[in-house]
């Protein structure tokens, strides 16, 4: 992509990146409104271009009206986007499009205009559409390194997942969100850049500049034809002894290709692109496949993969169908595809990437494949004939695979697969037209093959090989013990064997292995003709030359050792190692004192030993599975220096023994049980307390599993605790112990608290166990006491509720009849003293009824069973009703009641009945304990913090702090009569029951309000009730 500015630099600008990630159409214009400085794929499509390169640095011919509208905005000195409605298009069709125009600063500080609009297709594929070509590759990568969308040839780069993760971390740390460096792609490193577009969720734009790896190029693309290719070809044809065939080839070269399909067996491998939808239906197949297998055989668009597999007879195990359902990256799947008009089928290797929209909606798979016509084999079902309706008349059927396979000479030299041997090299393959080779009896096939490379071509191959080794050596990072070239060769063989072994598993970035070529050391030869099975490369070709000792084995059976291992161990051959005992004789895991070694030791043939570092890989080996063990001798510099301990004399030894005995005595004196455990979970020893706690003798418990000390229900918890400490997780730091149930030797159970710690040198553990029987007993007693208190409270509440109902019935009768007799409705009483008695009976009855009601209310409040109806309550009206009820009593006591209500006081959320009761109780107490001639003031206010406050202030006798505490307790009264004058003293019926303030406070708290009282002797009392803002219905 050309342009004065790198594409990714502008894409990473703050004003551009988020819209780019959403798939908006974006266009950056110079202030002349004609020069396009930058555009993304949707933006190019909006103005009628398919590629970004077609528009960048070009001239955009905008309509005059559109140019005028955008120019009007560009004159404004603001960075805020402005909406502009313009008509794009021409002729008979012109659509109204809403554009957002904003002023931006380019990376070099130059001012420009950003024109953007949302597009209906906001998928990830749409965001990078119009980008990427043969040398430029684009991808969107999420926060974990998963490719969300990519250009057509991006998958061919073979970028590993670890490389993508490193790029994401670097982009996150960069101040400008952009990282530009060379990026590893397979065996190459090419220029690239990554930019973070969004943070939540994280999305990155990755741009790679460079050609696809060589192993993805066909032989025709990778190798230039020698200058004398035609002359050499003419040398081949006479030697075949087939003049008609020669004439037919010349005619084929002179005439155009016929319209009917003809299979070209000698064609190089071809790559093709395919797409399937979320339901597995093919939506696109590139014509490269039809060019090899025929148009009828490649006609799959609109068909489901399962239907095609059933017709063509591949994927019989359903492995590819299962991968299409898993929605994950996969590769390396090989199947046999029927060839139209023949009795053959060709191998096809497939790989695919899942495709998601911007909303993470699964859209299907995008994949590529490689078809290898040179490896065609016979199709027993002859599906290709059915596809073409029979063998064409003008075409001879090719040789059967069995006959062709006999053409391969046994002495042909095998080389590495193209994946290893031809990396970064041009393949020595000469494409030629199809021709039939008729075998000649008594003559080897290798004699028929004449080199097509002259001396110049051979020199070029040698130069390419030298260049390949040099680049590989330079690209490899240093590791200890090997040269760069040796390290590269070892990695190549390990990677190749691993890919062969995992051919049927999914790999995120693995690419299909290209075809095998055969190259002789002196005279390179072209690939061998078709065979029934591809010749496998000799796995030992590279292993034999490695300086690293390598062993291929399965269990105790050794399949192969290289010369480096024989040299280091001193054995003559593999048979000598097998005769000596195989794998067991090579490695010694125990030292002379019988202890297990921490490192691996290689034993030589003469009995000497050498420490080594080992690396184990699972590989495919000659049709099966095996393990490849590579060894690296450990030098003296790598070994830890042995600790030089001074020789201890007898006195120091005795002192140490005495110190150990003292420590053992201290442990035996401790009341807690101490148990030492080895790394396998067995008991090493225990102190006297542990022995007495469980009833085991020391020697009786040693060597047994630690779990034997616990009941069955606690064994799992104890062992999980032990295993959790063996690692370096959170449990090893936050070690808070466990409560477990111990099991005595005689079967009894003990509640224990156990703490386990790690021992530093022996890798064992130390468990400290404490008997918590007394704690459990105390805990049980407290629990029982709490339950008993709760039961007593419930009984009291039930008793008060029952007695109140039993008393009310006769009490109401007494009060009612006394009022009836005092009114003399059925006749005069005739004596004033009887009338006084009736009034006393009525007053006493009401007093007892109030007492019963208070008892019932406070018991309900304590039990949480008070029936309250929360609603909007006008506090001023409730207090006014209470004042009206108390005014007659205040008049009798000659006490003045004043009120100060705030206007427009908002309502509160409360129970109306209880609020009135609270106001009556507070006014009653204030009037009762205020001397005649003094006053009681009731006020309300609306505070700035949203609280609604009610205050009741009196100028009565007041109380001290201790008296306030006494008055707030139920059934407690202060001795207020001592401070009253004798003439103003009242009888007990006017002194209350001691429930007024406690009941008032309980009702206030039941209404979610706050109760406060402040009183001073001789000055009066102030009671304040505060309703918080959550209980206020403010406008």
UniProtKB/Swiss-Prot annotation:
Keywords: ATP-binding, Cell cycle, Cell division, Cytoplasm, Kinase, Nucleotide-binding, Phosphoprotein, Transferase. Its main location: cytoplasm. Signal peptide: none annotated. Residues 500-533 are annotated as: Disordered. Residues 1-613 are annotated as: Important for polar localization. Residues 659-730 form the PAS domain. It catalyses: ATP + protein L-histidine = ADP + protein N-phospho-L-histidine. Pfam families: HATPase_c, HisKA, PAS, PAS_8. GO terms for molecular function: ATP binding; histidine phosphotransfer kinase activity; phosphorelay sensor kinase activity. It is an enzyme of class 2 (transferase). The modification Phosphohistidine is found at residue 805. Residues 802-1031 form the Histidine kinase domain. GO terms for cellular component: cytoplasm; plasma membrane. It is found in: Cytoplasm. Residues 614-1035 are annotated as: Interaction with DivK. It comes from the Bacteria. Its EC number is 2.7.13.3. GO terms for biological process: cell division; regulation of DNA-templated transcription. InterPro entries: HATPase_C_sf, His_kinase_dom, HisK_dim/P_dom, HisK_dim/P_sf, PAS, PAS-like_dom_sf, PAS_fold, PdhS_histid_kinase. Interacts with DivK. Functions as a polar differentiation marker. Essential protein that, by localizing in the old pole of dividing cells, controls cell division and maturation, probably through control of DivK phosphorylation status and cellular distribution, which in turn regulates CtrA, a transcriptional regulator of the minB operon. The asymmetrical localization of this protein is probably required for cells to enter a new division cycle. This is Cell-division control histidine kinase PdhS. It comes from Brucella ovis (strain ATCC 25840 / 63/290 / NCTC 10512).
């Amino acid at each position: 992509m050309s342009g004065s500015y790198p594409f990714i630099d502008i894409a990473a600008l703050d004003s551009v990146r988020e819209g780019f990630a959403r798939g908006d159409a974006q266009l950056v214009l110079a202030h002349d409104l004609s020069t396009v400085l930058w555009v993304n794929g949707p933006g190019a499509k909006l103005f009628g271009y398919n590629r970004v390169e077609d528009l960048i640095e070009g001239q955009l011919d905008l309509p005059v009206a559109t140019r005028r509208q955008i120019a009007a905005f560009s004159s404004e000195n603001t960075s805020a986007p402005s909406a502009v409605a313009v008509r794009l298009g021409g002729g008979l069709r012109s659509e109204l499009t809403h554009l957002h125009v904003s002023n931006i600063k380019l990376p070099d500080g130059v001012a420009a205009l950003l024109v953007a609009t949302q597009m209906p297709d906001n998928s990830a594929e749409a965001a990078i559409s119009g980008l990427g070509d043969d040398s430029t590759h684009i991808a969107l990568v999420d926060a974990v390194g998963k490719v969300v969308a990519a250009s057509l040839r991006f998958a061919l780069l073979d970028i590993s997942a670890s490389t993508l993760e490193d790029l994401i971390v670097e982009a996150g740390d960069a101040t400008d969100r952009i990282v530009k460096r060379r990026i590893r792609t397979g065996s190459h490193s090419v220029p690239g850049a990554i930019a973070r577009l969004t943070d939540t969720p994280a999305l990155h734009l990755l741009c790679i500049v460079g050609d696809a790896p060589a192993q993805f190029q066909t032989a025709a693309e990778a190798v230039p034809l020698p200058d004398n290719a035609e002359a050499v070809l003419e040398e081949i044809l006479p030697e075949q002894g087939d003049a008609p065939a020669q004439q037919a080839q010349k005619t084929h070269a002179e005439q155009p290709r016929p319209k009917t399909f003809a299979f070209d067996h000698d064609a190089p491998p071809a790559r093709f692109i395919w797409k399937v939808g979320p339901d597995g239906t093919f939506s696109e197949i590139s014509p490269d496949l039809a060019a090899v297998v025929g148009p009828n055989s490649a006609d799959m668009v609109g068909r489901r993969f399962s239907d095609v597999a059933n017709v063509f007879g591949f994927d019989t195990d359903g492995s590819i169908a299962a991968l299409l359902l898993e929605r994950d990256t996969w590769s390396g799947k090989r199947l046999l595809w029927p060839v139209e008009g023949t009795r053959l089928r060709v191998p096809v290797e497939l790989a695919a990437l899942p495709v998601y929209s911007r909303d993470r909606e699964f859209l299907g798979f995008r994949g590529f494949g490689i078809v290898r016509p040179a490896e065609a084999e016979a199709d027993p079902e002859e599906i290709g004939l059915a596809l073409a309706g029979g063998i064409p008349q003008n075409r001879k059927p090719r040789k059967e695979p069995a006959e062709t396979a006999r053409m391969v000479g046994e002495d042909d030299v095998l080389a590495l697969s193209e994946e290893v041997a031809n990396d970064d090299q041009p393949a020595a393959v000469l494409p030629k037209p199809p021709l039939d080779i008729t075998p000649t009896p008594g003559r080897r096939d290798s004699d028929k093959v004449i080199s097509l490379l002259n001396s110049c071509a051979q020199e070029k191959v040698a130069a390419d090989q030298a260049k390949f080794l040099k680049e590989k050596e330079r690209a490899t990072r240093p590791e200890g013990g090997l040269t760069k070239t040796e390290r590269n060769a070892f990695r190549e063989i390990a990677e190749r064997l691993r890919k062969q072994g995992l051919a049927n598993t999914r790999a995120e970035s693995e690419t299909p292995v290209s075809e095998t070529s055969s190259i002789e050391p002196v005279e390179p030869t072209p690939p061998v003709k078709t065979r029934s099975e591809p010749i496998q490369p000799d796995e030992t070709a590279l292993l034999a030359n490695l300086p690293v000792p390598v062993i291929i084995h399965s269990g105790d059976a050794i399949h192969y050792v290289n010369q480096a291992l024989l040299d280091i161990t001193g054995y003559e051959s593999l048979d000598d190692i097998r005769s000596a005992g195989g794998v067991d004789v090579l490695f010694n895991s125990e030292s002379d004192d019988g202890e297990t070694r921490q490192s691996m030791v290689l034993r030589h043939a003469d009995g000497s030993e050498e420490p080594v570092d080992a690396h184990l890989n699972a590989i495919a080996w000659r049709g099966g599975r095996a393990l490849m063990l590579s060894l690296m001798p450990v030098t003296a510099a790598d070994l830890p220096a042995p600790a030089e301990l001074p020789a201890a004399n007898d006195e120091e030894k005795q002192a140490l023994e005495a110190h150990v005995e003292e420590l053992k005595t201290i442990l035996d004196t401790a009341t807690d049980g101490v148990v030492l455990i080895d790394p396998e979970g067995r008991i090493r020893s225990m102190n006297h307390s542990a022995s007495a706690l469980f009833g085991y003798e020391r020697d009786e418990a040693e060597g047994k599993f630690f779990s034997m000390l616990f009941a069955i229900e606690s064994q799992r918890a104890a062992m999980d605790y032990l295993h959790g400490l063996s690692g370096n997780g959170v449990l090893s730091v936050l070690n808070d112990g466990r409560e477990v149930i111990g099991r005595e030797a005689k079967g009894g159970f003990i509640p224990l608290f156990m703490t386990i710690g790690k021992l530093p040198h022996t890798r064992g553990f130390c468990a400290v166990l404490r008997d918590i029987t007394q704690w459990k007993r105390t805990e049980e007693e407290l629990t029982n006491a709490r339950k008993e208190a709760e039961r007593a409270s419930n009984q009291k509440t039930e008793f008060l509720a029952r007695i109140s109902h039993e008393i009310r019935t006769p009490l109401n009768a007494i009060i009612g009849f006394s009022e009836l007799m005092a009114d003399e409705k059925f006749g005069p009483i005739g004596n004033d003293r009887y009338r006084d008695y009736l009034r006393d009976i009525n007053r006493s009855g009401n007093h007892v009824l109030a007492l019963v009601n208070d008892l019932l209310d406070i018991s309900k409040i304590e039990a949480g069973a008070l029936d309250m109806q929360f609603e909007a309550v006008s506090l001023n009206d409730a207090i006014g009703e209470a004042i009206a009820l108390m005014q007659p009593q205040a008049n009798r006591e000659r006490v003045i009641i004043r009120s100060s209500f705030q206007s427009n006081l908002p309502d509160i959320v409360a129970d109306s009945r209880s609020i009135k009761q609270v106001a009556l109780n507070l006014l009653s107490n204030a009037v009762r304990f205020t001397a005649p001639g003094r006053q009681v003031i009731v006020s309300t206010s609306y505070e700035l913090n949203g609280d609604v406050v009610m205050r009741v202030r009196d100028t009565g006798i007041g109380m001290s702090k201790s008296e306030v505490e006494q008055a707030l307790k139920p059934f407690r009264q202060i001795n207020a009569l001592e401070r009253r004058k004798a003439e103003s003293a009242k009888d007990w019926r006017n002194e209350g029951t001691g429930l007024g303030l406690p009941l008032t406070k309980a009702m206030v708290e039941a209404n979610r309000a706050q109760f406060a009282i402040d009183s001073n002797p001789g000055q009066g009392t102030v009671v304040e009730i505060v309703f918080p803002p959550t209980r206020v219905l403010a406008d």
